Design a protein with these regions (language model features):
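Helix-loop-helix hairpins and the membrane-proximal interhelical loops
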Residues: 1-49, 165-168, 205, 209-303, ...
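Helix-loop-helix junctions within the multi-pass membrane cores of secondary transporters/permeases
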Residues: 2-36, 57, 78-87, 91-139, ...
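Alpha-helical membrane-protein architecture signal
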Residues: 12, 16, 184, 266-270, ...
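Residue-level signature of catalytic and energy-coupling elements of molecular machines
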Residues: 19, 39, 123, 199, ...
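Hydrophobic/aromatic residues within the transmembrane alpha-helices of Major Facilitator Superfamily
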Residues: 23-30, 63, 67, 144, ...
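Loop-to-helix transition at the N-terminal end of transmembrane alpha-helices
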Residues: 44-63
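Juxtamembrane transmembrane-helix boundary signature
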Residues: 58-79, 110
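Membrane-embedded alpha-helical modules
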Residues: 93-210, 346-456
C-alpha cells in the first residue's frame, strides 16, 4: 500500500528510512509549537488555542504535501509571516486578530486559484537561480534576527534603532538571565550539531529550558510578567482538553468589519497576499535548494501539488486560528537523513497531530529557549550563499541587496521586491538582458513592485 502511494522503490528508499527521516524533520521543527504561540499571543490570541491550531494546521498541511506532491517537505505556520501577523497587521496597523485571520483565509482562497492557473508556478520558475539562493540566505538572516529579538539579546535603541542587551540593572534576574541562557543555548545547540546529534535543535531547546528551570528553582531567574518573562516550570504535562481551541476556531468567520471599511480590509488582505506569495515562494525555493531538489533549470518538479498543499493548509490554518501555513526549511534535515517521498512528510504530520495532547508542556517553554533554534536555523540557510557568483556584479549586487533588505526591512517580501527590481534594471541597462534570458514575467514583476512603492 505504502509503495503504491509513495513510490518508494522508484525513489530509491524504504519505509524505515522514510519514517526515521520524518521523525528527524519533526525533531528539528517542533520548536514552532512553542514559538508560534509566543508570537501570535502578542496580538491578543489565546496561546493554548494557538498551540493546538498550530499542531493541527501543521498536520493538515504536511499530510496534503505527502499526498498531493509526494515530497518530504513539512509545513507549519511560517516564521516571518507570524511576526507580520502580530507585529505589523495587529500591533502596528491596529486591526483585530480576527480580521487578520480573515485576510489570511481570503488570500489562501486566492492562492488556490493562482495555483490552479499556474501563476505561482510561473513566478517560481521566472526568478533567477542567483536570486533564489539570495532569498534563502536573506530568510536565514531574518529568522536569526527574530531569534535575537525573542531572546531579548537585541533591544530597541533611540540612537541606533537596535542595540545589544545590557545585563546590569533591575531586570537582570529576568531579562538578563534569559538573554544569557539564550546565548548558552546557541552554544549547546552548536555543539550538538557539530557532534551530529539527530534532533540537535530540539535537544538544544530542551536543555536550555531545563537550565531555565534550575535557575528559577534556585532564584537566579525571577519571572517578571511586565517584562514578558514568565515562569518556566510546567504545572501539567498532558491534556486531553481541547476546549481552548474554541477561542480561535471559526473566529475568522466572526470578523467585525465595523469601523474598518472594505478598502481597508482589502489593503490588509493585499498585504498578506503580497507577503505570503513571495514569502512562500522564497521559503519553498530555500527548502528545495537546500535539499538539492531543483532541476538544472532551477525548476521544482510537481510544484503544483506542493503549492496546492500550501494554499489549502493556509485556509485550514486560518479557520483553526493561526497565521499562514508554509513549507519549513527544516525539512532539509529529513532529506539529509534519506527522506525522499511523502512518507517522510506523513510521518512528520502524524507526530504533529500527537503533539496536541502535550500542549501544557509546550506552552511553558520560554522564548529564550526557542530563540537559539531560530538563530541556528539562520545558520543553516546561509549555506546557499556559496551558490552566488559575487565575482559578477550583475549577479552579486542584486543578490546582496536581496539579502540585506530582508532583516533590515523586517520583511522577506521586501527583500524579494528589491532583488527583482535591481536584478532586472542592472542587467537591462548593462546590456545583459539577452545573455541572461530574462523572463517576461520578471519585467512584469519589476513594474508591479515599482508601482507598489510609488502608490502603496
Amino acid at each position: 500500500m505504502l509503495e503504491n502511494i509513495f513510490h518508494l522503490k522508484e525513489n530509491h528508499t524504504d519505509v524505515k528510512t522514510e519514517i526515521m527521516a520524518g521523525i528527524t524533520t519533526f525533531m528539528t521543527m517542533a520548536y514552532i509549537l512553542a514559538v508560534n504561540p509566543n508570537i501570535l499571543s502578542a496580538s491578543g490570541m489565546d496561546s493554548e488555542a494557538v498551540l493546538i491550531a498550530t499542531a493541527l494546521a501543521s498536520f493538515v498541511g504536511t499530510a496534503l504535501m505527502a499526498l498531493l506532491a509526494n515530497y518530504p517537505f513539512a509545513l507549519a505556520p511560517g516564521m516571518g509571516l507570524n511576526a507580520y501577523f502580530s507585529y505589523t497587521v495587529v500591533l502596528t496597523m491596529g486591526y483585530s486578530w480576527q480580521l487578520a485571520l480573515m485576510a489570511v483565509f481570503v488570500e489562501g482562497v486566492i492562492f488556490i486559484a493562482l495555483s490552479l492557473t499556474n501563476v505561482r508556478e510561473g513566478i517560481f520558475n521566472a526568478i533567477p537561480m542567483t536570486l533564489k539562493s539570495a532569498v534563502s540566505v536573506g530568510i536565514g538572516l531574518f529568522v536569526a534576527f527574530v531569534g535575537l529579538q525573542n531572546a531579548k539579546l537585541i533591544v530597541n535603541s533611540d540612537s541606533t534603532l537596535v542595540t545589544y542587551q545590557h545585563f546590569k540593572g533591575a531586570t537582570f534576574h529576568s531579562v538578563g538571565v534569559g538573554a544569557i541562557l539564550a546565548l548558552l543555548g546557541v552554544v549547546i545547540t552548536a555543539i550538538l550539531l557539530v557532534k551530529k546529534v539527530k534532533g540537535g535543535i530540539l535537544y538544544g531547546i530542551l536543555i536550555t529550558w531545563l537550565l531555565g528551570i534550575v535557575c528559577e528553582l534556585t532564584g537566579i531567574y525571577v519571572p517578571d510578567v511586565d517584562a514578558g518573562m514568565y515562569s518556566v516550570i510546567p504545572t501539567a504535562f498532558v491534556s486531553f482538553d481541547f476546549s481552548a481551541l474554541g477561542e480561535t476556531f471559526g473566529q475568522v468567520f466572526k470578523t467585525d468589519f465595523s469601523g474598518v471599511g472594505l478598502l481597508n480590509f482589502f489593503a490588509v488582505m493585499f498585504s498578506f497576499l503580497f507577503v505570503d506569495l513571495f514569502d512562500t515562494l522564497g521559503t519553498l525555493i530555500g527548502v528545495a535548494s537546500k535539499a538539492d531538489m531543483l532541476d538544472e533549470d532551477g525548476r521544482l518538479p510537481n510544484i503544483k501539488g506542493a503549492l496546492m498543499a500550501d494554499s489549502i493548509g493556509t485556509c485550514v490554518g486560518a479557520v483553526l486560528g493561526t497565521s499562514t501555513t508554509t513549507t519549513f526549511v527544516e525539512s532539509a534535515s529529513g532529506v539529509t537523513e534519506g527522506g525522499r517521498t511523502g512518507l517522510t512528510a506523513m510521518t512528520t504530520g502524524v507526530l504533529f497531530l500527537l503533539a496536541t495532547i502535550f500542549s501544557p508542556l509546550f506552552l511553558t517553554i520560554p522564548s529564550f529557549a526557542t530563540a537559539p533554534a531560530l538563530i541556528i536555523v539562520g545558520f543553516y540557510m546561509m549555506g546557499s550563499a556559496i551558490k552566488i557568483d559575487f565575482n559578477d556584479p550583475s549577479e552579486g549586487i542584486p543578490a546582496f541587496l536581496t539579502i540585506l533588505a530582508m532583516p533590515t526591512a523586517y520583511s522577506i517580501s521586501e527583500g524579494i521586491a528589491i532583488g527583482i527590481i535591481s536584478w532586472t534594471i542592472i542587467n537591462v541597462i548593462t546590456g545583459k538582458a539577452k545573455e541572461k534570458k530574462i523572463s517576461p514575467l520578471m519585467y512584469v514583476l519589476t513594474v508591479l513592485f515599482i508601482l507598489k512603492y510609488v502608490f502603496l
